Amino acid sequence: MATRNNGKSKAAGSKSGGGHGVGPWLGLGVIWILLDQLTKIAILKTFAYGESRPITGFFNLVLAYNRGAAFSFLAAAGGWQRWFFTGLGVAAALFIVWLLKRHSGQKLFCFALALILGGALGNVIDRLVYGHVVDFLDFHLRGYHWPAFNVADCGICIGAVLLIIDELRRVRR
């Protein structure tokens, strides 16, 4: 069964109603990309590759390159991974834009997707421009270092956690 809304057909029970369309969510994604890219530019201008500067007892800024995916997965592959992960990031971004269009009224869901979109495209830009992802956030404890990451990765992780929270809330309703 379909209902009419401003002359557009919408499936009954659709959860996308309301909202201001996809524009604000795409805008948030662009803001996240800019934050990611500006921080990377600042690090690239002030650090030599491998240089590390302690900030606290558990956090350093460091310039590291990642030719693979999360945790340097496939970093040592023969170079094909650059294009594979670039294509994967573009495909994910297109799917996210489609989801944003379908569900623009679901605030938490779309906020999460916008962060993931910004993060995915931030890392795609790195792969296209540099041939690798620029990482610089280094957390450590008692000699163990979490793999270095960046603002784009933060967007992806925060977005993923928010998607889980959104789904848990939806299941409870």
Curated annotation (Swiss-Prot):
Keywords: Aspartyl protease, Cell inner membrane, Cell membrane, Hydrolase, Membrane, Protease, Transmembrane, Transmembrane helix. GO terms for cellular component: plasma membrane. It is a multi-pass membrane protein. Its main location: membrane. Pathway: Protein modification; lipoprotein biosynthesis (signal peptide cleavage). The keyword Cell membrane applies. It is found in: Cell inner membrane. The active site is at D135, D153. It comes from the Bacteria. GO terms for biological process: proteolysis. GO terms for molecular function: aspartic-type endopeptidase activity. NCBIfam families: lspA. This protein specifically catalyzes the removal of signal peptides from prolipoproteins. Belongs to the peptidase A8 family. This is Lipoprotein signal peptidase. The gene is lspA.
